[in-house]
Structures are given as structure tokens and as C-alpha cells.
Amino acid sequence: MGQTASRLLTVEIVDVCREIFSGRCSRVVAPAADGEVGVLPRHTPFLTRLRPGEIRLRTEAGEDQYFYLSGGYMEVQRWEVSILADQVLRSQEIDREAALAAKRNAERMLRENRIPGERDRAYLELLKALAQLRLLERLNARKMGRNRL
């Protein structure tokens, strides 16, 4: 059952290279710095930093869309959500083998490196790879009928 336009959020997702999504949604879920946050129409306005993770949208047509986010910022107004990120990938753009290789490389760097700045970078790369892999796992579980938005 469709929802009226007056009950939907206008959502924009962009990264440094392109506009990823522009449309109307009934729900947005994003990985805020302090935990996952869900946004519905008429939400209290706020601005938050986003950590690596997944963005989930429920579109005007009732379709669920999934994106990987490397980190960024989200601004929420009562009827609008804007997400600005370093990198955003649609779920179908994620390369599982590349994410596994990045995970292994980051784990190796964490084991071998004692320089604090280098360890911080390796940890961030590990978080990014794990976020991509978790999103793929969620989608596989969803295909098997075991998971919902």
C-alpha cells in the first residue's frame, strides 16, 4: 500500500564522486557514531557523524534499498535527510573478494604494526571491510527469508 507524498521523507545520498540516491522514503536507517539511528517523517532535526556501515531505505514504492557507507555526515530535518559521505556503494557494487582481502590485510597490519597512527588506519580499514561483509551477509539472509529491514 503506497503512502502519500506528505508522509514521506525526501532523501539525498551523495559521496565525493556522485549522487547515489535521490528520492522519497518512508524510513532511513544509518550507522551514526553512537549507534544505529532510524529516521521517520517528522523526526526531530539533528546532525550526526556516520561511521562505516550500512544505510537502509524503505522507498516510496515500499522497496528496501541497501548501501555501504565508509563514513560521513547525516543531516535530518522534519521532512528531509541528507547524507554526505566519502564513499557509498550500492549493495550490488560490493566486491566480496575485495572486502575479504581488505579484511585480511587490515588484520595483518593490526598484528604487525605498533605505530599508533598506522594502527588507527588499519582499524578503520578493518571496520570498512567488516561493514561491507555484514551487508552482504544481511542480504544473503534476506534472500533466504530470515531477515527484515
Swiss-Prot record:
One of its GO terms (cellular component) is proton-transporting ATP synthase complex. Keywords: ATP synthesis, Cell inner membrane, Cell membrane, CF(1), Hydrogen ion transport, Ion transport, Membrane, Transport. It is found in: Cell inner membrane. GO terms for molecular function: ATP binding; proton-transporting ATP synthase activity, rotational mechanism. It is a peripheral membrane protein. The keyword Amino-acid biosynthesis does not apply. Gene3D superfamilies: ATP synthase delta/epsilon subunit, C-terminal domain, F0F1 ATP synthase delta/epsilon subunit, N-terminal. Produces ATP from ADP in the presence of a proton gradient across the membrane. F-type ATPases have 2 components, CF(1) - the catalytic core - and CF(0) - the membrane proton channel. CF(1) has five subunits: alpha(3), beta(3), gamma(1), delta(1), epsilon(1). CF(0) has three main subunits: a, b and c. Belongs to the ATPase epsilon chain family. This is ATP synthase epsilon chain 2. It comes from Methylococcus capsulatus (strain ATCC 33009 / NCIMB 11132 / Bath). The lineage of its organism: Bacteria, Pseudomonadati, Pseudomonadota, Gammaproteobacteria, Methylococcales.
